Amino acid sequence: MKILGIDPGTRNCGYAVIEKTGNKKTLIEAGLIKIKQDSLQYQITQLCEGLDIIFKSHKIDAVAIEDIFYAHNPKTVLKLAQFRGALSLKILQIHGEFSEYTPLQIKKAVTGKAKAAKEQVAFMVKKMLGINQEIKPLDVTDAIAIALTHSFNVRIS
């Protein structure tokens, strides 16, 4: 089963494809959809084009995204919500469904602690997948953690 984890953002969108075979999880690909600072419409287009490439490159069985988080700046929340809406629509058009996890659920699934620091999440992601090199940036680590969280919550049919 191939799982796509997505960490939505307005500047960079982290993504990771992992494969789950029984209890074994393997990282297939991870990276960023880089979003150039331009008009909102163009930024959303970049995000959707990046998703198209990922879906065309892999036979994805499941998609998981991080649920929207609270931000202090209302403009940031609004922009992220617009990105999230476009992201959701694109996934539904291509794949048909997706699962959502809050940051606390992801941290708890990966580290055992809902209030874990990002560095703890990064450490556990590397440990779980047997990766020795550093994974950067944290958007990518978060996307891997999202995919792993879904892998713990799904049964292979």
UniProtKB/Swiss-Prot annotation:
Cofactor: Mg(2+)
Residues forming the catalytic site: D7, E66, D139
Organism encoding this protein: Campylobacter fetus subsp. fetus (strain 82-40)
Protein name (Swiss-Prot/TrEMBL): Crossover junction endodeoxyribonuclease RuvC
Pfam families cross-referenced by the UniProt entry: RuvC
The record's free-text note on cofactor binding: Binds 2 Mg(2+) ion per subunit.
Binding site for Mg(2+) 2: E66
Location relative to the cell: Cytoplasm
Alphabetized PROSITE patterns for the sequence: RUVC
Catalytically driven reaction(s): Endonucleolytic cleavage at a junction such as a reciprocal single-stranded crossover between two homologous DNA duplexes (Holliday junction)
NCBIfam families xref list: ruvC
Family from the record: Belongs to the RuvC family.
Gene Ontology molecular function: any one: DNA binding
Keywords, comma-separated and alphabetical: Cytoplasm, DNA damage, DNA recombination, DNA repair, DNA-binding, Endonuclease, Hydrolase, Magnesium, Metal-binding, Nuclease
Function in brief: The RuvA-RuvB-RuvC complex processes Holliday junction (HJ) DNA during genetic recombination and DNA repair. Endonuclease that resolves HJ intermediates. Cleaves cruciform DNA by making single-stranded nicks across the HJ at symmetrical positions within the homologous arms, yielding a 5'-phosphate and a 3'-hydroxyl group; requires a central core of homology in the junction. The consensus cleavage sequence is 5'-(A/T)TT(C/G)-3'. Cleavage occurs on the 3'-side of the TT dinucleotide at the point of strand exchange.
EC number of this enzyme: 3.1.21.10
InterPro entries: RNaseH-like_sf (IPR012337), RNaseH_sf (IPR036397), X-over_junc_endoDNase_Mg_BS (IPR020563), X-over_junc_endoDNase_RuvC (IPR002176)
UniProt-annotated binding residues for Mg(2+) 1: D7, D139
GO cellular component: cytoplasm; Holliday junction resolvase complex
GO terms under biological process: DNA recombination; DNA repair
